[in-house]
């Protein structure tokens, strides 16, 4: 599979409010298969979420997991296959608008009967431990093939999540999770900070089998998540979990060649990199003062100077940019 991640700015047309912005940074992580993609990947994605959030020093978060095949299958049992998309988008608003308003939309906008709306609300209200929710879902099994497939996949994801070392207090089977975008086809996720419910989801995603089909005539099933970094860092900053001592410079050291031939400087930079440090090599033929001005702008902690004398002696000069010591 093709495994990729990126961090970039994204834009969304929504009302700006606490923790929600129209322009923000987002991290995307995806695994794309060629023709098929094993269910194991649908557990690895939330396992990555767990490790990232624990790495940030967060513990009070919950990865809520569901499978859209279960929802589609259940709606089919009620004779509502043609309205499943509208129903899912409505159910996805449950946390924001509450059960009463969801029921009203199901009745007035989706055209459901009272019995159908009540049946859906009872279904998504199934709660308990992961084992208890899965056991309750077994009571619906055998009536719809898609439902049964989704239940089988959800069971596999929960088993594999435990194998990845994700504790149950950090993930929960939650039948209210639907994701409003129609391209999701299987497992779906939403991650919330339990001590900041007003922020909403800070990380979400799911399985998408047919998304590439909008662009190319080839099956490229995938699964992925997006982390709202700006929203998340807003909370981390409030809680004092952002470490200002972490390096902000793009490199640990800047190597400044002081000769016309860069060969020795290139070799030195590679040697330092092999030791696990981040190194930037200055390649412009400029005056020493301009080179040091660049180093100051870069805010690197160390500058490595390599001139003719250093090359001849097999040494280099290192300047501590904070103290000025060399």
Name each region found by the language model.
Residues 49, 78, 85, 100, ...:
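Juxtamembrane helix-loop transition sites at the ends of transmembrane segments
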Residues 1-59, 105-326:
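Positively charged, Gly/Ser-enriched RNA/tRNA-binding surfaces
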Residues 71-72:
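Short, well-ordered alpha-helical microsegments
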Residues 64:
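Ligand-site clamp/hinge motif
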Residues 79-107, 193-195:
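Acidic, His- and aromatic-enriched active-site or binding-groove loops in soluble protein domains
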């Amino acid at each position: 599979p093709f495994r990729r991640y990126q961090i970039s700015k994204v834009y969304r047309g929504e009302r700006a409010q606490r923790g929600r912005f129209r322009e923000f940074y987002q991290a995307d992580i995806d695994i794309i298969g060629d023709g098929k993609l094993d269910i194991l990947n649908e557990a690895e994605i939330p396992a990555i979420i767990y490790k990232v959030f624990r790495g940030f020093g967060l513990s009070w978060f919950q990865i809520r997991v569901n499978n859209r095949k279960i929802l589609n299958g259940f709606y089919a049992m009620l004779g509502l296959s043609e309205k499943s998309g509208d129903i899912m988008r409505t159910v996805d608003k449950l946390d924001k608008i509450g059960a009463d308003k969801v029921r009203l939309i199901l009745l007035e906008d989706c055209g459901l009967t009272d019995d159908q709306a009540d049946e859906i609300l009872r279904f998504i209200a199934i709660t308990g431990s992961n084992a208890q929710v899965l056991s309750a879902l077994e009571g619906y099994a055998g009536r719809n093939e898609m439902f049964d497939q989704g239940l089988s996949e959800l069971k596999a994801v929960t088993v594999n999540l435990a194998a990845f070392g994700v504790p149950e207090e950090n993930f929960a089977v939650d039948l209210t999770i639907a994701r409003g975008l129609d391209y999701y086809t299987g497992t779906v996720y939403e991650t919330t900070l339990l001590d900041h419910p007003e922020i909403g989801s800070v990380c979400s995603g799911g399985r998408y089998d047919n998304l590439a089909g909008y662009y190319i005539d080839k099956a490229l099933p995938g699964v992925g998540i997006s982390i709202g970094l700006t929203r998340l860092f807003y909370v981390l900053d409030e809680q004092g979990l952002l470490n200002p001592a972490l390096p902000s410079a793009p490199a640990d050291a800047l190597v400044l060649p002081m000769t016309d031939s860069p060969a020795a400087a290139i070799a030195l930079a590679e040697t330092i990199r092999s030791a696990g440090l981040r190194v930037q090599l200055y390649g412009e033929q400029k005056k020493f003062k301009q080179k040091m001005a660049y180093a100051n702008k870069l805010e690197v902690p160390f500058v490595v100077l390599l001139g003719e004398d250093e090359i001849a002696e097999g040494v280099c000069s290192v300047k501590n940019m904070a103290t000025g010591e060399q």
